[in-house]
Amino acid sequence: MAAAEPSVAALAGGGVGAGAPSGGVPVLFCFSVFARPASVPHGAGYDVLIQKFLSLYGDQVDMHRKFVVQLFAEEWGQYVDLPKGFAVSERCKLRLVPLQIQLTTLGNLTPPSTVFFCCDMQERFRPAIKYFGDIISVGQRLLQGARILGIPVIITEQYPKGLGSTVQEIDLTGVKLVLPKTKFSMVLPEVEAALAEIPGVRSVVLFGVETHVCIQQTALELVGRGIEVHIVADATSSRSMMDRMFALERLARTGIIVTTSEAVPLQLVADKDHPKFKEIQNLIKASAPESGLLSKV
């Protein structure tokens, strides 16, 4: 059941047309907690309504997200998806609803809809990042799992001219892309193009460094594009454990899934009868390092 929207009479001037330009059909445009009256030409369809939403709320609408327009149906007492071919003929209430929060919170992982992102596991970070050796070990195990299951892998290197290449322990065999970057987020134009080439991508499994910088900014940018993000807690770290802790807490509050290197491959196979289960079982037979990453600070 949709949350109650402000009544027409409660709006300024006592009507949805109040404050709306004359000569059109009055419509109440609702988005998030806001409701603004405006008017549109008689017969206005979906494209016109979207443009009106953008003119009213453009500074608040993330254009990378997917939305649905809904119409308040008096018959049902709640909002329903805008009927196909809808055209405005009388005053009505519409709302713009972002889809990805509702559609991507279950946390299911399947090989055809998943991509692995390995972020900036470079040699120059070795002395500075807490438990770097442990996250290299766990990251390498994740990449082995990706190869077993045929999952695409994208790797970035932050300013490799100054910070060096990906550490030698990370096996790049079969990796889809290895890209240099200066931007903190991994969401580069080349990465977006690569994702567009993979049909049905819904989830990204993300790991690397630093948790509170490149990992955090990558995760938030991906979520803004409607992609579900799983951050592997035992494969990400920072120079400061406090930075790492608060970044993971913040990301979890935004709906990003914080998981582990054992949970990910088991979720991907999902069944002991999966043809690759034995290989995954052998991969995770030895537990991940019990490092200080378990500490909060």
Curated annotation (Swiss-Prot):
Induction and repression of expression: Down-regulated after nephrectomy.
Entry keywords, A to Z: Phosphoprotein
GO cellular component: cytoplasm; peroxisome
Organism: Rattus norvegicus (Rat)
Family per record: Belongs to the isochorismatase family.
Taxonomy of the source species: Eukaryota, Metazoa, Chordata, Craniata, Vertebrata
Residues with PTM Phosphotyrosine: 159
Record-linked InterPro entries: Isochorismatase-like_dom, Isochorismatase-like_sf, Isochorismatase_domain
Tissue expression per record: Specifically expressed in spleen and kidney.
N6-succinyllysine carried by residues: 278
Entry keyword Repeat: no
The organism's place on the tree of life at top rank: Eukaryota
Protein name (Swiss-Prot/TrEMBL): Isochorismatase domain-containing protein 1
Intrachain disulfide bonds: none
